[in-house]
């Protein structure tokens, strides 16, 4: 149900926060950020950026800048007049590589 989805989103957001702490604004971080943000937007979250900022432990302005960078570097497409966007092949590949690597969650 909805709680399950929300829990997954919160987990992903927290994981993004850990990546940011450990690696800075790295490829896995931007991919994770884009993916979590897209899920939030798809859920119809009214304020995905503040929610994301809370999970990551940074200010919304900072997270907004990171999302801009994620779009610029090709992790997330821009959809005019709509929150969210589509994840790109690059994002999928980076996340897959991360999850399958030693510092992933297995």
Regions found by a protein language model. Give the residues of each.
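Short, charged amphipathic recognition helices of the HTH superfamily
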Residues: 40-54, 74
């Amino acid at each position: 149900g909805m709680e399950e989805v929300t829990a997954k989103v919160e987990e992903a957001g927290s994981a993004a926060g850990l990546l940011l702490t450990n690696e800075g604004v790295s490829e896995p971080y931007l991919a994770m950020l884009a993916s979590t943000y897209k899920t939030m937007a798809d859920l119809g979250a009214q304020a995905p950026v503040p929610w994301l900022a809370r999970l990551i432990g940074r200010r919304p302005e900072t997270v907004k800048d990171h999302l801009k960078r994620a779009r610029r570097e090709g992790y997330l497409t821009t959809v005019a007049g709509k929150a969210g966007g589509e994840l790109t092949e690059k994002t999928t590949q980076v996340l897959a590589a991360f999850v399958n690597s030693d510092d992933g969650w297995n």
